[in-house]
Amino acid sequence: MTFRATILVTAAFSLLPPLLCYAAPRVAPAQAVPHAAAGATVTWGHARFTVLTSRLIRMEWSADSHFEDRATLVFLNRQLPVPHFTKTSDANGITLETQDLTLTYHPDAQGQFTDKTLQITLKGGPTPVTWHAGQKDTANLLGTTRTLDGSSGSHLKSPMEDGLVSRSGWSVVDDSQSPVFSVSPKPVVRKTVVDGAWVEERTTAPHQDLYFFGYGHNYRQALTDYCAVAGRIPLPPRYAFGVWWSRYWSYTDQDLLSLVQQFHENSLPLDVMVVDMDWHLNEDQLKKRGLKDLSGHRLGWDGYTWNSTFFPNPTAFMAQLHAQGIKVALNLHPASGVQSWESAFPDMVKAMNMPENTQYVPFLITQKNYAQAYFSVLHHPLEKQGVDFWWLDWQQEKTTPIAGLNPTWWLNYLHFTDQELQGKRPLVFHRWGGLGNHRYQIGFSGDTISTWESLAFQPWFTATAANVGYAYWSHDIGGHSPGAIDPELYTRWVQYGVFSPIFRTHTTKNPEAERRIWAYPEPYSDILRTSFRLRAELKPYLYTEARKTYDTGIAFNRPLYYDWPEENDAYTMPNEYIFGDNMVVAPIVQPVDPKTGLVQATLWVPPGQWVERSSGKTYTGPTKITQYFSLHQTPMLIKAGAIMPLEEAVSGQSAEPQHVIEIWPTSQKEKTS
């Protein structure tokens, strides 16, 4: 049984969510203290060891004995309270011992870290665990990958990267090739992204730079400490947890305003309007003019000039959306640079000090003059017109002139920093660029194939990204291609989307690819409407859990083994995950039996008392339950005793919704089977 209480919004209460959820500035390169605290480092020959926590040790070897104290792309802040540790030495080398680890270094003539010269033993636990330098981690719990483009299920273009946690009890991050942030000789007041810290290559001298995480199965502490040295996971703006509309289509401004009106007429919430590539001059229009993209990329995929045929008055268009509480995002493919037909082209040529007869400004994002103009000439004028944030789509290249720097990573950093410098709550919507990108929140997972296999893969994939601190994957709900989607599959995808970090529908430019939920027949349309409204109701809960993510470094959408690491079943239920501290969700990812209209699903009930939402039955775990679910049901467990903040579903942010407290009391008579 659940109890709901509607709270009348008063002036005092309306202040409560911001007070609870305001996130202090994250640790950024310009704010970090990359030098370790005095007493944390031990140097031995060509090696230096930095004891960051009792379970996290940095290990450096340098042929010329010059060690790196600047922030890298991944590790920014090494000045932590120094844990107690001891150092002993003899003719063979040294031993460092913390409360949890014992490090032994017996260098050979070169001193490099090898399986014979460096080892670390984890204390405690039923059996000792010893790591040797260079050892492969065969039990790593994985992290994430750059993109799901073209994937159907687990068939990926690029493999999953290792995570920071492992059933082995340890993981190692090799930071040897990571670029560094420069250090200004004197304090700098940052007004633009090029002021102060800037990216530089590492030394070319032979070196090793490793970070050993020896946390056993305390995965939560591993991620908390990782975020202490690598920067926090920023809290997205509240609107990001609502309903996003996105579709690749040649919309006009009137088409989109009509679409918003249809949301209102159907009493459906809408918080974010994403406008895909046709907001700017598109491929068909440019081909008719006989133009060619001199970057070599696809014509019309990038642009900074409004498509006046579709958007004759973009400022007025975005003002109308803002008046209804709807935020606006525009799509970009920045790697194309700036072509000669762009309205901003003359100003870019001037800003780059290029000749007047220049035909094309290439994408030179690692050069300060380009980065400065990229924002001041190309983006800020559009933001003044009303653009709230940018969808930075696929970056065709993976390298830059700076060794080890991926342009995706660097763009994420620059866009986030630019918003901070403008005093905004930053929001970046882009691809995963690699370790350290957890600081630039929302990931676009790419163009998946609309299959049951794709849907079935996403719950595991999304939760697993917690292992590198990447808390906010956004998927194309319904998949991207090829076109029409089975109504049942779309319904189940939307139901999963409700219980994912970001709720965003999308599809390719195909008239048969329908994402308007009122266009579907019953019973699908009614179930889809219920799901959209449920997502809006969950915003206070999600925002609260996102604040916890900021505070702890532990993603609210995470694998079961974070909270129950010694329960084997927590590792064997790939479709089941934690969704905030009070919920465990296991979305249906297969079709119902056409004869019964039901599908069988098994849930693992974690230790403690839990209420199965659809039946209202209370179970005490650990145990497994198997039952049948209809199309309108999503398997879900609510922690008994949970008090969950919710709100009524309204469109946008212009209307103040009623706040609701939902209480799930404990049961005196526990259902165990």
Language model region names:
Residues 241-247, 274-275, 326-339, 392-395, ...:
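Aromatic-lined carbohydrate-recognition surfaces of secreted/lumenal glycan-active proteins
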Residues 234-399, 438:
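Aromatic-lined carbohydrate-binding/catalytic grooves of carbohydrate-active enzymes
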Residues 416, 436-443, 457-461, 465-475, ...:
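Catalytic core of carbohydrate-active enzymes
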Residues 89-237, 247-248, 260-265, 627-650, ...:
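Catalytic and substrate-binding clefts that recognize carbohydrates or anionic sugar/phosphate headgroups
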Residues 353-394, 423-451, 505-527:
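Alpha-amylase-like alpha-glycosidases and glucanotransferases acting on alpha-linked glucans and related
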Residues 27, 52-91:
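A low-complexity, Ser/Thr/Gly/Pro-enriched, surface-exposed linker/loop concept
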Residues 21-23, 30:
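Boundary at the C-terminal end of the N-terminal hydrophobic targeting segment
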Residues 9-18:
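Bacterial N-terminal signal peptides
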